[in-house]
């Protein structure tokens, strides 16, 4: 990608009114003889995504460290997210509350070492090729930054206490009783900044809320932008939402008001770890070109340091879900949206969605997940060395990495805009 191309793709977007005017004025000279196609509202909305705004939102989230659930830094991050959503014009914010019980602390399991062969991965996947060890860092001293050690020092309290998700809703003009849910999880672990897992997904959802909340933007159907808590403890925030809200779908309240506190779910779209697709782990070499060995004499494996040229956005559904057929159609609709509107990276569709906040929804509504790699087959095989580690820092990622996240945002924005009948009024 040339510097000129990068600049063109990441330059600050123009206001909606200017874009609409330019779209309409361009063909005026031919207006008397040639029919004028109306401007494409989806293209206009996708054009409002901006790399620097996306990066700035991720950076803002990192001020709260790893945002571990149950801590003051997690609650402060929720407050910050809600304030941002309101500042965008998505002012009808709400909190969904639930109780979570933190078990007594136990000695963490050792990271899984890679094994030969092709064993089963999570979500029905199969593991192939070289694999690096994975695990969750629980050692404060593994974080060399004293400031981050202090910021992340408060542990989750044991016992049962209150947790919250936060969300806001773009209310549809024609069908407010129906909605698509667009989500990401805002909590993290590992003693880092949780910049990628899942600051990258949280920032994506917030950017979509910003754009859909702009004056003049209308959708026929509603869109709910949700930031889940307690993903890292077992998808508890998303599960609480499903448990509390699934039986309220499509109910008008009060009767005759035209208001639907929980519109009927048409689809759930999750975003988790959006930026790092450097490829399969490879043997690391010393200065003499010899393989590096660990303390057990095994080769040290790690993914390449640069984003690979063939990086893509992975769109997953779960083949065993009750709504698998609808989820597959939704996934392929998003793939088509990527083909038409994304700027740098393509998308691929897989059917092993697992271990993410769309999973509690998948037997209630078509549900898909967008991410940097397949969750079971690739992330679970050590393709991301920063996963749950103290190195999940804003500074660990390049613009090529951030751009992959932005392309996922382009994909979801375009797909949701098409499905909800988005319009941009002059």
Residue ranges and their predicted role:
Residues 15-27:
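Bacterial N-terminal signal peptides
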Residues 228-357, 363-367, 374:
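Metal-dependent peptidase/peptidase-like ectodomains
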Residues 2-18:
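Bacterial N-terminal signal peptides that target proteins for export
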Residues 166-168, 182-236, 412:
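Alpha-helical metal-binding/catalytic segments enriched in His/Glu/Asp
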Residues 40-49, 62-73, 152-157, 187-199, ...:
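Second-shell loop/turn segments in exported
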Residues 60-169:
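A non-catalytic alpha/beta surface segment that caps or lines the substrate-entry region
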Residues 33-72, 88, 96, 101-108, ...:
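N-terminal capping segment at the start of a domain
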């Amino acid at each position: 990608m040339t510097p000129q191309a990068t600049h063109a793709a990441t330059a600050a977007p123009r206001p909606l009114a200017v874009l609409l005017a330019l779209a309409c004025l361009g063909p005026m000279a031919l207006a008397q003889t040639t029919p004028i196609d109306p401007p494409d509202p989806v293209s206009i909305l996708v054009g409002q995504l901006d790399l620097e705004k996306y990066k700035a939102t991720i950076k803002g989230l990192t001020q709260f460290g790893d945002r571990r659930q149950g801590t003051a830094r997690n609650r402060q991050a929720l407050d910050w997210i809600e304030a941002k959503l309101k500042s965008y014009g998505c002012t009808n914010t709400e909190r969904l509350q639930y109780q979570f019980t933190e078990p007594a602390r136990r000695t963490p399991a050792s990271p899984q070492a890679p094994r030969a062969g092709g064993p089963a991965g999570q979500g029905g996947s199969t593991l192939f090729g070289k694999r690096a060890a994975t695990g969750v860092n629980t050692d404060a001293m593994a974080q060399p930054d004293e400031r981050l050690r202090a910021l992340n020092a408060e542990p989750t309290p044991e016992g049962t206490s209150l947790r919250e998700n936060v969300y806001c809703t773009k209310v549809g003009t024609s069908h407010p009783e129906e909605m698509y849910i667009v989500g990401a999880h805002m909590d993290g672990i590992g003693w880092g900044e949780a910049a990628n897992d899942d600051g990258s997904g949280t920032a994506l959802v917030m950017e979509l809320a910003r754009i859909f909340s702009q004056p003049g933007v209308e959708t026929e159907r509603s869109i709910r932008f949700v930031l889940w808590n307690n993903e890292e403890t077992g998808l508890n925030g998303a599960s609480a939402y499903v448990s509390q809200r699934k039986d309220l779908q499509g109910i008008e309240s009060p009767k005759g008001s035209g208001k639907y506190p929980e519109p009927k779910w048409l689809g759930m779209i999750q975003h988790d770890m959006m930026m790092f697709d450097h490829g399969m782990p490879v043997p690391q070499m010393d200065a003499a070109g010899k393989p590096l060995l660990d303390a057990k004499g095994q080769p040290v494996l790690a993914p390449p340091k640069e984003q690979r040229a063939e990086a893509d956005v992975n769109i997953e559904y779960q083949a065993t879900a009750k709504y698998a057929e609808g989820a597959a159609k939704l996934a392929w609709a998003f793939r088509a949206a990527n083909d038409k509107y994304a700027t740098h990276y393509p998308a691929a569709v897989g059917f092993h969605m697992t271990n993410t906040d769309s999973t509690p929804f998948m037997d209630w509504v078509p549900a898909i997940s967008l991410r940097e790699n397949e969750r079971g087959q690739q992330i679970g095989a050590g393709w991301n060395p920063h996963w749950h580690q103290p190195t999940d820092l804003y500074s660990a990622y390049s613009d090529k990495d951030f751009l992959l996240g932005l392309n996922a945002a382009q994909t979801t924005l375009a797909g949701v805009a098409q499905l909800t009948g988005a319009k941009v009024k002059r």
